[in-house]
Every structure is written in structure tokens, then in C-alpha cells.
Amino acid sequence: MQKKRSRAGAAEQEAASDDGEMSDSSDKMEVSQNKGKSGIKRAPEADDVLRPVKLSKSDLYKPPTNDELNRLKETENLFHTNLLRMQIEELLQEVKLKEKRRKTIDGFLHEINALLGTIPETPKTDLTDQSWLSSSIKVPFLQVPYQVKGKFSFLPPSSIKVVGSYLLGTCIKPEINVDLAVTMPQEILQVKDNLNQRYSRKRALYLAHIASHLTDNKLFSSVKFTYMNSNHLKPILLLRPQGKDEKLVTVRIHICPPPGFFKLSRLYPNKNNVRTSWYTEQQTETEGVCDPPTPYYNNTILSDLTLEHHLHHLTNCATDFPGMKDAIALLKVWLHQRQLDKGFGCFNGFLASMLISYLLSKNKINKVMSGYQVLRNTLQFLATTDLTVNGITMATCSDSSLPSLPDFHEAFQVVFVDPMGVVNLCADMTASKYRQIQFEASESLKVLDDTNVNGFHLLLMVPKPFVRTFDHVFHLTNVAKLQGTCKKMKLLNQLIDRGGDYLATALPYLLSVLSKGLGPRVSLLSHTLTHKPEWNVGEEPAKHKDSGLVTVGLLLDPELYTNVLDKGPAADSSEALDFRAFWGEKSELRRFQDGSICEAVVWTGGSLYDKRKVPELIVKYLLELHANIPESCINYTGNALDCVLSRGRETSTEEEKMVSIIQSYDDLSRKLWNLNDLPLTITSVQGTHPCLRYTDVFPPLPVKPDWSSYHLLREKKCLIPNPEKPCPAYVSPVKVICHMEGSGKWPQDKDAIKRLKAAFQIRLSELLSSQHQLLCNPSATHTDVYKDGYVFRVQVAYHREPQYMKEFVTPEGMLKYQDTEESMQLEMETNHLPHLSSTLHGLHQQHPAFGGTSRLAKRWIQSQLLGDSFSEECLDLLVAHLFLHPAPYSPPSSALVGFLRFLHLVATFDWKNSPLIVNLNGELKGSEYTEIQNDFISARAQLPVMFIATPKDKKDSVWTKNQPTAQMLQRLIVLCLESLRALEQQLMDPRGNHDYKMIFRPPLDLYDVLIRLNPKQISRHREAVDQPAKSFFRGMLKEGAQVKDLMFPVVGYDPIQLFLQELREAYGEFALFFHDLHGGDVIGVLWKPSSFEPQPFKTTNVKGRQMDGKSDKALLVPNAEAFVEDLEILGEGLVAGVEAQTERWNI
């Protein structure tokens, strides 16, 4: 039975704010979670798992009604599942405005209407004489230049009408915006007010006078100004009710001219309405020079003229078409979750409504379609239609005097013309922003077509913040520098058109330059601007230099973005001149292998660490060359966390080290395959160390030990630590599983198999030494091979050994099989782990960011002292899920964005009620997904708290079977939420704290005892998050140093881990111990609350306890003071000090 989640299937939802038909407001939408009563019932147990309801036989076989049959047929035709239909219906029910609330809003609107009619008139004055305005009110308009012709006086509005989504019935919660169109009387305006911002300034003065008479009225909790869609030429007034309804609604006052007042032909995109001589404050116009067109300025006035006409158009379309209203609501939610519905040049609710009406007029949709069908068709249209090349128009009039689509394309980057044929609804949208919308629509359709995912949840419930969507993000921190950009690019005409807004003027040109320069390295480039906020009516509007940040995001091509060479045209071609002009001094002539001589640009990049910085180098170079934006004004965060994967003072993330290890491993594999005189044939050689799948946080380095720092065992040609010297650097053995063929020579007793394997280990050592001159150190369980500076730990395996370990004989003499801890461990090491490692190695080849993402995730887990609770394989699988099931995103192409998504996945996944399915190699099919879900639900109480299913492990979750505990998982979820919030805030606010290592420093105040460690004895000291203040010689010679005779280094020696093991064995019943494996200099100790309950006086309870002096009975309690003393005694030489944080103790 399918599990149903009522109330749109989620407890929390960030959804679209209601932008009205012109809105860009945004806030989180809370969707309540009420479990449906149909087919679902809560089990009485405390495990809080959903279980099927048992129906009576009569209910089970009752024939369906006609309505039910019709609904089932409709569901089958329109939706993947009945669940999707129910989720959409519940979401619409949640976001639509209830009738009770509508009545409250209507009452508020009537009161506003009455107040607007009582505002007194003012005498007629020059536009520049604003002395009549109250000194406590500031005009919401940047009046530059200040001098302008014209007269102004305030007269009561000629009409006040509700426009936008409220009347249409398409506004959605949580924030309801109601748009009021307040029409200025014709007497205020003059015929030539379309020129030189006269109308715009009269509009602002009219708004300011209204604000002065409403600001102290007790009806309102707040009266504020803001810009409509961050367009500074269109200020509006925001009114919110007093009392409990303050957050219910925001009424937005739009000032507009009387219908038909301005002659439309004067405002076509090829006409000029802002004189250059006026804007530059020149006394006379230059003779023979025509003023350039002002399409953006003209479009702003036209949009005010057509408010009512657009409402009538949408009302006619929505008549007898309930699916249109539902689709608008769904599309608003979709846009909001992707942060596309707010700010300058956004795709808001009004635009979505007009697009749906366009599709209706072109018969792409019809009035019998459901909201879901309309949504799908709209997304399909967006994904396949490029409005930057082939604009669309809703105009049906054949008037030849109207501007043509080519006229609009000449003036605007994106073209969508309104029904009147004069307004470009996408005038402020850049081509880059539209391509982002296209990309999101295309990705969303893929999600909807995938029956193995919850498309509703991914499309409409999961937020896609900008910083988590793009692989690299950078900020232009000093917007004032764009003034110089406009001058450098000679954009005076465009600047005049934009009313001096140099950010909006320069942005399209900057994006064009970057897109050309980055070329195939990026598959998508887009931007977001800081949303211009509301401000009090007594404050001056923010100047352009205070506009905030310009943030640009790059979606990288994983194969191409690290390219260090840009090959240009042939040196003698006509394009070569343009190439040199674009790249400046970076362009040079180069001869290529095919003999051609071409222009080229070469970027420095020896290591992969350097190559990942190529997009950053290109961005900074081009912005300085073409836009006069210095490097100091660019905050590039794409590689912000590389520093935590570097050792000590090194500036490398060591991918090349892993490639070197893999090459050495491949060579060893060949040597093993080709060994002569082995009693049995080798059937497979498989590496299992994380570095062989590119996920080791700090891969092993080639080592050459300095004899003087060790004691020498000459007969074994190996070294042992010298206690008088600092602990040697940690040498990690690279584990290799060597499977031998099955044969009758193998015994059938598990102990005999172990002895035979030990003999094989010795024989392997002898053959590798004699045939390939490798230094080997055999033992009963493995053979260590010292090769190329690395130590490979070769372990012989026999595929039937785990089976023999499971054998036991019953008292009746029957042979049976039962899993034992030993058999499961061996099976994991010799079967599951080799297969997983080879699969993840392949995944990294397909997605190069996989390794870096996994390394960051593991480094962060260790830094939070939780490394012992989560296996490396568990974390690798969590990261693999991000790449194999990235929806609603595309697979990450940078480790940073992969890490952000890792934090979000762990923090938000429903671990209690859902298995995390990782479809490695795409082996799982639809029916297997259902099988895993059903098996999980039926056996939930017996399964691990974190359940990860793979094609080879559908029922057991072997990598999380023992760890984490419920408490550790809950702790991780809390840390993920907080770290995600902090890191995203840092990445999106370049003016704040730039210490990205902050989230890698654990809070220590929650521990009861802190054990400070002696840095001399920390073998991985250089791996610490913060570079150690003092370094020690760890007994290793520098790379390239010559040695006379090789000696086996000290392998796998980490005294801190050995100390931790002792502590857990001795005091595990009293406390938990936490440590950062990678250079952590502190061990955190937490008391176990249950261990401090008094125990009866028995010999079995005496260890670590003392008599309870407060009790009359013979009871024992833990001796905490002695425990603290024991820590220093046990850790002599390792422990620098013990801090008992007794203020936390609750004993």
C-alpha cells in the first residue's frame, strides 16, 4: 500500500509569495502536516512509523462509484500516481486564500479607499519647488538631475481600482499582496510629461503626499516605500493593517496616469523621451545629433498605462478555466523555490499569468485542462522556446504602425509583448536570467517524467537557493565601480535610458563579456541582485552605489572548466583581430601539434588545485580589462573550502597524490597477476583504501624514513618508533584484497583456512621480493609491500571462507548457518568493500567533483569529533546519492556546492520513515524501488536509524548497521543545519566573516571533560584545520632525498587512536570519547547519564566506582574525580592536561 502524506506531504514548505500580478515579495511558506485518514493509521508503538490500515472485507471489495471511476481514469491519464494528485490538491488548498481572510482584506481595502478620497489638495508649484511637502516625508525618487520643467499640484484620485492577482483569485499565501491602481487626475499632467522624467517625478510626489497623510493613521501598522521589482523608476507605497492582521496582507499603492493620456506612439521602443542635453545638464543640444531611443524608460510608463487592460485580459482568459488559476498558483510556487520571482528582471507571478494566457490564445492549452497539465505545458514551452532570439507577442491587431518584434529585439534582450502590442513584459530581464529559467524548466520536466522520484516534492517543496544551485559563485562588492564600467564601455545612452542606474545598465554587458570569455567552460551563467528593501517614508531612497551586491553564478562543465588553453582563430584570419581585442595582452601566437599557428590564451595551472581556479582567473582578468573592475572588488568563493584539504603550509588538495598511488597500485596489481610459482591462481586484485576511489581526506604520501629518528630492527629491515623523538608521521597502509581461486586444495575448516592463508601471505612476500625486488613484511593476516614510497597491505581472500565461518552444529547434530560478527566483518572486507570501491572509482571518473565533495564531508564530520560514528563508506554513499540522484539540481561540478548539498541532505532527509536509495550503476529498476520501500516499512523497527540501500544491499544497510546511534544521528542533523546556515550566509555575504574554516571548529563547551593532547605525539598534526603554531620533525626525508638502504617505515602507528581504544575499553560504560582523527589536539568526554545511577554493592560493579556516602544503603556511584586523575596517568606522555568542566556535570 502506498504511503500517503497529507497536507502536500511535508511539514515545512518554502513557497512562492504572492507577487500580485506584479509581485516579487518572498517569504517562507509553512505548510501544516496533518496525516490523512484514508488508508493510513498511526501505529500505537513509540516508533512513530506509518502502517497500513486493515479494512473489513465488505469495505475492501465495495464496487467503486461513477465519480470514483471518473477520478481514477483522470488520474491515470494526467498523473503518475494518485499520490501526486493528492499532493497537488493539498498544496493548492494550503496556499489559496480562505474566504474568511478575503472578507477581512475587503474591509481593509474599503477603509483605504475612503481615506484616499479625503486627502487635501495642494497649490500648483514648479516640480522643483517641493516646499509644500511635509519635512518628515522624503520623495521616493532619485531626482538627478534636479532641474526639470513642469508644474505639480495634488488633487484627489480620479479612480481607485484593485488590480492584479487578488481580483483574479490567484494570489497565494503566506504573504498576500493586493495592488491598488490609484489614477492621477488629468489636470495634474501636461502633454509633454512623458519627457525627461516629468511623469515619473509627478508620480513620486503624488505618492509622497499620500504617504504624508497615511503615515500617522492608526489603521496602519506600517507605511513604507519600496521599488516595484527593484525598478527605481517605479516607487510604490506599502500599507499593512494594525493588530493581529498585520502579516495577513500588504496593500501596494501604484500611481498611474489616466487611460489614453499619453499617445502610445510616442512611447514605442524606437522613440526618445529623455533628452541627452537635459540629463547631462548641457545648455544647448549638439546640432546634427539625434537623441538615442529610450526603450526601457518608455516601457516603464507604458506598463503604468496598461495595468487595467492587463487585468481585463487575464480575467477573460480565466473565466470558466479553473485550471488556469491552479496552474498560476503552482507556477508561482515553482518560481519562488528557485528564487526567480523577485528582484530586478524577475519572472514574477504577473509574467507567469500572462504566459499562460498566451499559451491559451495559441491553443497550446485549453480550458478543460487541469492545473497540473497547464503547469507541464508551460514548463515545456519555457524549456523549448528562446525568447532572446524568437520573441512572442500577444497582440492580435494588424495595425502596421505598432512596433514589430524585430523592433523589440533591437531594444531588449528578452521579448514578450503584451496584448496591446506596445509593452515588453520582459523588458528588465537579461538573457542570462531567461536562460536560467529555460534550464530550470527543462530540468523540472525531467523530474516529472521520472517515475522513481517524488516529482511533486522535488519541484514544489524543495527550495533551490542560488548558492546551492551554481557550482561557482562570485560577488561584485563595490557597485560604485560600475560607473567606471559604463564610461569604459561607452554606455551613456543606455545609462540615460535607465535613469542613471549604472548597475542595471552595465549588468547585461558584463554578463555578455563573461559568457564569451568563459565559453564552453560553463553550461549556464546567471545572476542575482540584492533585493532593494523597503524604507520608511521619512528616509531618503538609497543611492545607486548602495544597491547592494551583484552575485553571479556559474554552472560548470565538469570536463572543460579546468582547461588551461583557449585556442583562437588562425593568425591570418579576419577573426584574429577581434580575438586579440577581446583578450588583450593575454592573447599570443602558438603553434599547435597539427601544424597550425593560431591565436591562443594560456592560463597557469600545473596541479588540479590550480586548474580549478581557471574560471576565477578568467572572470577577474576580463572584468578588469573590459569593465575597469579591479580584483579587489571581486569576491570569488568557488574554491573557498580547498584550504581545509591542504596539509600545513601546502597549497594543494593533493589529487595528484591519489593519481600517483593508483598508478603504483596498478603496477603492483600487474606484478601480482604475473607472479610465478604460486600454488593457486589469483582471480582478482581489488584495492579498498579510500584513496583508490579518490575519497581519502589526506591521501598517503610517498615516504622515506630517516633512520636517525627510529630504532632499527636490521634482521627484519624495519623501523620502530623512538620514544625520545616526536611521534613519526602517520603512514597509512593501502589495503588490497587478493582473491585466490577456489580449489579442492582449500580445507573446509575455518581455522585451517586461516593457517593456509598465512602460508600464502608468506609465499606472496617471498615471490614479490625475489621476482620484483620489493621490500615486504609478511604476517599471518596480510603482507605489507613497500613500493614507490607507499605501503600496500595485501590480504589474501578465499570466497567461501565467510560461509565456513557461519557454520555451527546443533545439539541434534544438524549443520546450520548463522551470521557471526566475524563472518560479517570478513564478508564486508572481502566482498562488499571491493565492489563498492570499484563502483565509486567509476563514479569519480564520471563526476570529477565526487572525490572532493566526499573528502570535504569526511573532513567536516571528523572536525565535529563524530568520525567514529560514521564509517567512510557510509559517507561516500551519502555523497554518491548527490551525484546519482541530484534532482532538483544538476550533478555538482565543484566540491563546495556538493558539500552544501551534503549538509542539506543529511539535515532534511526523513531518516525515520524513508530509506536512502543509492542506485549505483543504475542497476535498480522501478519495481525494485517499491520493493525496497515496502521491505523497509515492514521491518523498520529492526533496521538501523540511518538506512542506506544499494543494488547489492537492499535489506541490511551493511555500512550503517552498527553506527550511527539515534543520538549521534540527531547530533549530526543539528550540526548540519547550523553549519549549512552559517556557511551559506558567509558565501552570500562577502562583507561579513571570511573565515570559512569556522564551521570546521567544533564547540567544546558541551563536553564534560577535555583531554588536551601533546602535539609531539599527534602523528597527523599537519592535517589539523588550523595550521599548528609549532611543527616537529616527524622522521621523514624530503621528496627526492637519496637513501643507501631502504627500511620498512612504521606503518599505521597513531598513538592517539591507541590511547582512545584503551579509554573506551576501560571507561566505555561511563563515558563517550570524541576526537578529530585528522590532527585533533583535544579529546572530548561526555558522561553517560545512565552510568551515574547508583548500583548495588557487588564485585561486578566495583570497577570505577566508590561507596555512595549520601545513601543509607550499600550503593556504588562512579568515582568521577578518580576517573579524571586516571586520564592523566593512562595518557602519560600523550596528555598535556585535563580540564574538568564541572559546571556541566549533573551527577
UniProtKB/Swiss-Prot annotation:
UniProtKB keywords: Chromosome, Nucleus, RNA-binding
Highest taxon above the source species: Eukaryota
Region Disordered, annotated ranges: 1-49
Claim: RNA-binding is one of the keywords in the record: yes
GO CC list: chromosome; CURI complex; small-subunit processome; UTP-C complex
Compartments, record wording: Nucleus, Nucleolus; Chromosome
Nucleus as UniProt keyword: yes
Biased composition (Acidic residues): 15-24
Pfam family, one: Nrap
Gene Ontology molecular functions: RNA binding
Disulfide bonds: none
Coiled coil region boundaries: none
InterPro entries linked to this entry: NOL6/Upt22 (IPR005554), Nrap_D1 (IPR035082), Nrap_D2 (IPR035367), Nrap_D3 (IPR035368), Nrap_D4 (IPR035369), Nrap_D5 (IPR035370), Nrap_D6 (IPR035371)
One record GO biological process: rRNA processing
PANTHER family, per the entry: NUCLEOLAR PROTEIN 6, NUCLEOLAR RNA-ASSOCIATED PROTEIN
Function per UniProt: Part of the small subunit (SSU) processome, first precursor of the small eukaryotic ribosomal subunit. During the assembly of the SSU processome in the nucleolus, many ribosome biogenesis factors, an RNA chaperone and ribosomal proteins associate with the nascent pre-rRNA and work in concert to generate RNA folding, modifications, rearrangements and cleavage as well as targeted degradation of pre-ribosomal RNA by the RNA exosome.
Family: Belongs to the NRAP family.
Assembly and oligomerization: Part of the small subunit (SSU) processome, composed of more than 70 proteins and the RNA chaperone small nucleolar RNA (snoRNA) U3.
Protein's name in the database: Nucleolar protein 6
Gene that this sequence comes from: nol6
